[in-house]
Amino acid sequence: MERLLESIASFAAQQPQHLALADNAVILSYCELLQEIERVAPAIGGRRVGLLMDNGCAWAVIDLCLQKNGVASVPMPTFFSDCQLQHLIDDASLDTIITDQPLRIIKLLQTSLSTELTVAEQKFDCFHLNPVEKSPLPARTAKITYTSGTTGQPKGVCLTGESIERVTESLSEVVAAMAQDRVLTLLPLSTLLANIGGIYAPLYSGSSAFLPDMAECGMAGSTGVNAELLISTLNHVQPTATILVPYQLKILVEAASRGATLPNSLRYVAVGGAPTSPVLLDQARELGLPVYQGYGLSEAASVVSMGLPGRKHNSVGRPLPHIKVRIADDGEIMVSGNLFSAYLGQSPRTGDEWPTGDIGHLDSDGELHITGRKKTSFATAHGRKLAPEWIESELTSHPAIVQAVLFGEGRDFNTAVVVPNCASAAPKIADVISVLNHTLPDYARISRWIIAEEPFSFRNGLANGAGTLDRSAIETRYASQIERMYQGGECNAFL
């Protein structure tokens, strides 16, 4: 990460008083940021350092200190369960944990011994461990980012500083980042996308990065969103750019449709992390939101492609300059040119390409289109192949439906498990599905559905930390109800 640190030093000389980082309580100019990095870096020891912290200036400063020290930075998602955090600590062989949540660490480590570290006017606890190193790190590992996955324990993706910088530089180039930009981060900094889009790219470009704590901007856990606080944060910061997941965009669109005022400062809103309904994107654009889809994965150091102004709205954009995309014969998206070194504890990655597990195509203009997941696509009993994400994104584009999962592998018709926006919205779902069915080919229509008992979340094991639904877990949880739908039992039906 030498080039990023050099950029910060350069901007500290060129524009010393220009705002670099800000959160709810702290503002750091580029000069102050450089001074804080130089002050804090010598105080942080260890070789594998975990960060269990809320968003804020301190998170960014500590992470940059670790890069300066040549130490592996290991973000620890605050939305992980205690079991998953324990797995991460053991799997990564952490020797230091820096946290603003000491009680969680005390519970896990069964020790209260820690030292105090002050960063960006905030005090943190430093826990020093004596781990048995399970796995050597691949050469030049700068960051280990844990994917929450949909099955099994989280996996550590080992990335070099060079691979992260290539994405940072490409992203800054294609979005034409400039010093006047104000970039607001509304995703947890424990996610790689938030690191790159919310910290590295702004600082590489001389822009200003705003890192409010998650609760203050309306984020609760990995899935909860308070629309009032979210919109208040947007209007207070007046950002020129931000990154949203589809559910956050849906909340903004619904609020704006009810008369809420959104800032007119935005020139670029990236949406990614899950399939986004074309209907929702159109609604957002009609409200004046400059939304563009992106696509990426941790194994490619985050962003692979980005939609841009003046380009097609129904794609996830062209691949960034630093990476190559190829479509395999079976439709799977293959990426090369900027890949991870290995999963921690596993053999080094081999080959020049990585199979993403996503299905898609490149159009005649070189724009990438995602149609579904290779593992989730299914064939009906009539031999028609279907990517369920397509139907699910159409369902959740309606305000009455928050989440939905489609089933139909080898069956005569499709069924769905649906989460309504609230109890009063449940009666509206029949109308929503009826209208949608009239726009779908016969093999894609929903014939029967049931209302879920509760939202699909990380806490109940029905979604991962990024909000991606765990289809297998949902199918297992509702197996008997799904089977009854196919046997003609009690359910909602259009047969």
Model-predicted regions and their roles:
Residues F124-Y146, Q153, A176-V183:
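Conserved pre-ATP/AMP-binding loop-to-beta segment of ANL
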Residues S205-S207, P239-I243, V253-R311:
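Gly/Ser/Thr-rich phosphate-binding loop
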Residues S315-P319, A328-W354, E367, H382-L386:
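Conserved ATP/PPi-binding loop(s) of AMP-dependent carboxylate-activating enzymes
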Residues S29-Y30, A142-E169:
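Conserved AMP-binding A3 loop
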Residues E6-L28, E453-P455:
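AMP-dependent adenylate-forming
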Residues E165-R182, L189-A241, P246-K250, E254-S257:
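Conserved AMP-binding/adenylation subdomain of ANL enzymes
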Residues Q17-G46, G50, D54-G56, L64, ...:
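Conserved AMP-binding/adenylate-forming core of the ANL superfamily
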